[in-house]
Amino acid sequence: ITPASAKVQYPRGITFNDDGSKMYVTGTTSGGVVGMYSLTTNYDVSTASFVAKTTIGGIAQDIRFNNDGTKMFTAAFNGSDGASNSTIREFALNTAYDIRTIADVDNPEEYNPQAIDTGQVDGLAFNNDGTKMYTTDRTDGAEKIHEYSLSTGFDLTSTITHLGSIDISGLGTLAPTSLIFNPDGTTMFL
């Protein structure tokens, strides 16, 4: 698929549903969108066909779901400088993994990681039970990965604690916009 034919311009983040039969892509056109695609062969993007897109506001950078697909999370920012109003957003879905059923697209739960001095939040990941959240950001030429604990898994209204960060500027990455872990959490991919 190509961005022009895919209905989502300037794609940034990508994720799949639990069985790989659906793919989701965030785009930064017109205030941030999420596109949903059906895959006739699981995890084979060459078999993708466009299903729907939903405007979610902000400039959507990355996307993740909780384990049962009833919550969708995006890393997004508002403002041309990228750093202003960076947020992690939590959207409730009435039907698992179906972006057309977002309960209240205009009022998602939000967490503002800038309270701990991060820059533009781009990447977003969770551990398997959602009690740890990871973000990537860019601040003044430095690229970092931040780790947070959530008192309740996959719940941005729970107590969120910043556990620390590492500077990855010298690792050969250039402003990573996404991150993900292997199933047992021993390997991180940027």
Predicted stretch roles:
Residues 1-190:
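Polar, enzyme-active/binding microenvironments
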